[in-house]
Amino acid sequence: MAETKIVVGPQPFSVGEEYPWLAERDEDGAVVTFTGKVRNHNLGDSVNALTLEHYPGMTEKALAEIVDEARNRWPLGRVTVIHRIGELWPGDEIVFVGVTSAHRSSAFEAGQFIMDYLKTRAPFWKREATPEGDRWVEARESDQQAAKRW
């Protein structure tokens, strides 16, 4: 039975606490995880903090649709998507994606697909605090290109 966990909120998460739920199914031979962190730099500038905003309800729906699309493309077991919001600092974890499948290729591809689509289709907005002031982070062309390959 396929199971999905989607969480959007300000609370920190623990990769060590998320992994056991992903790994407990004996029918899954592969567990792939990705964790994204706040960098201390972007576009050549120092980043002191990152504020993430979202559209409540719509964001969770968009993430569920992305996971459903991944499930339609690959035979997946469990999927976890966690995305933090609020003010974060360099080194803080922002996003966690965990995917299980019977085989590694499906798990790797689905995890990458989910991240590529999350970056381009989920309604999140980022504002960076730099020494020169705050600025909104615009979508990257490289993220759009990554999503197009699917």
From Swiss-Prot:
A Gene Ontology BP annotation from the UniProt entry: Mo-molybdopterin cofactor biosynthetic process
Crosslink site: Glycyl lysine isopeptide (Lys-Gly) (interchain with G-Cter in MoaD): 119
UniProt keywords, alphabetically: Isopeptide bond, Molybdenum cofactor biosynthesis, Transferase
Stretches that traverse the bilayer: none
Reactions listed under catalytic activity: 2 [molybdopterin-synthase sulfur-carrier protein]-C-terminal-Gly-aminoethanethioate + cyclic pyranopterin phosphate + H2O = molybdopterin + 2 [molybdopterin-synthase sulfur-carrier protein]-C-terminal Gly-Gly + 2 H(+)
InterPro entries: MoaE_sf (IPR036563), Mopterin_biosynth_MoaE (IPR003448)
Gene Ontology cellular component terms for the protein in this record: cytosol; molybdopterin synthase complex
Chain positions recorded as substrate binding sites: 37-39, 103-104, 119, 126-128
Pathway noted in the entry: Cofactor biosynthesis; molybdopterin biosynthesis
Consequence the record notes for mutating residue 140 to A: 2-fold lower activity than wild-type
GO molecular function, a single term: protein homodimerization activity
Outcome when changing residue 34 to A: 4-fold lower activity than wild-type
Extra information: The cross-link is not seen in all structures of the MoaE-MoaD complex.
Subunit structure comment from the entry: Heterotetramer of 2 MoaD subunits and 2 MoaE subunits. Also stable as homodimer. The enzyme changes between these two forms during catalysis.
NCBIfam families per UniProt: PRK10678.1
Function according to Swiss-Prot or TrEMBL: Converts molybdopterin precursor Z to molybdopterin. This requires the incorporation of two sulfur atoms into precursor Z to generate a dithiolene group. The sulfur is provided by MoaD.
Name of the protein this chain belongs to: Molybdopterin synthase catalytic subunit
Species for this entry: Escherichia coli (strain K12)
Upper lineage: Bacteria, Pseudomonadati, Pseudomonadota, Gammaproteobacteria, Enterobacterales
